[in-house]
């Protein structure tokens, strides 16, 4: 059973996060291992497996990038361990420039303001790519959506580096 069916949700990228959380809690209560403590071992094992599936499904559908990767995996695209070479040289150049810019921010005289501006630009790029990805997934443009997901991975890693730099800078004050 796929995760969308498990949670009683339509198999599309946009989803009702509150409904997902509600269904998750309902399923957690229904299959919590404590409810099966006095059952035979087979029942306990099945309940534990179901609880694990519920947790994994919830974490997958809850996070936008994981949800997109899951949807693509349902269509035969395995992006989880992929070593796909990015073919978009303009995008790769942009990534190199952004990483160089981020490295330079740490040594700038007005680090906080420059980092804030950089972070704002990066968030806009991520938002644009997520909107593209949503449209592509909804239109079943799987190949294009897979490429967009790959690009979002780069941007997400860069965003994590921004957050790490922010934490280091806050620690310096």
Curated annotation (Swiss-Prot):
It comes from the Bacteria. GO terms for cellular component: iron-sulfur cluster transfer complex. It comes from Xenorhabdus nematophila (strain ATCC 19061 / DSM 3370 / CCUG 14189 / LMG 1036 / NCIMB 9965 / AN6). Belongs to the HscB family. InterPro entries: DnaJ_domain (IPR001623), HscB (IPR004640), HscB_C_sf (IPR036386), HscB_oligo_C (IPR009073), J_dom_sf (IPR036869). The keyword Glycosyltransferase does not apply. GO terms for molecular function: ATPase activator activity; protein-folding chaperone binding. One of its GO terms (biological process) is protein folding. This is Co-chaperone protein HscB. Keywords: Chaperone.
